[in-house]
């Protein structure tokens, strides 16, 4: 696959919350850093997307944790329309991902699943893309569900083809 990285599609999910705030800050020497941080009730969502060599595709935010039924809906409504014959969908080895219905949907499109070994996030370059997503979400300070969804939507457009290509290269999927 190092010769045809344009056929690789990496998917994963990550959690997003309305309490995300910057992890670091600056203050003058001798002064204490003061920054507002949310306290109390917050909303948690699951963000799932696909990373290709030229961009982030099929983004989806749901207001609950991922399970097999929701994963099947994601594959059918969001991911499958973006796939081409010969695409290989690479994902982590979660039990909710091992769905015969989702595999059949991909087979109809001429694509297939390839599961990563357990506990190997370094083999999934979308983890690097999620790091950027979370940094931008912290900066956006979205405190409502609607604001979080809008922030995620605008951040998804920030991934350039060169950046996505470098994610694949850093994970070892592109030959020099």
Report residues per predicted region.
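Short functional hotspots at interaction and active-site rims
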Residues: 1-176
């Amino acid at each position: 696959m190092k010769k045809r990285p344009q056929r690789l599609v990496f998917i994963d999910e990550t959690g997003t919350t309305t309490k995300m705030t910057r992890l670091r800050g600056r203050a003058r020497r001798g002064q204490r850093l003061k920054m507002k941080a949310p306290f109390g009730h917050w909303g948690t969502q699951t963000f799932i997307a696909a990373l290709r060599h030229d961009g982030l595709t099929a983004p989806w935010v749901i207001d609950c944790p991922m399970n097999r039924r929701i994963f099947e809906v994601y594959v059918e409504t969001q991911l499958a329309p973006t796939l081409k014959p010969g695409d290989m969908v690479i994902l982590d080895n979660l039990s909710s991902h091992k769905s015969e219905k989702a595999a059949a949907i991909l087979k109809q499109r001429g694509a297939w699943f390839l599961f990563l070994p357990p506990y190997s996030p370094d083999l999934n370059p979308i983890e690097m893309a999620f790091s950027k997503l979370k940094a931008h979400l912290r900066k956006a300070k979205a405190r409502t569900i609607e604001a979080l969804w809008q922030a995620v939507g605008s951040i998804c457009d920030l991934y350039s083809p060169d950046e996505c290509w470098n994610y694949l290269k850093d994970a070892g999927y592109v030959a020099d």
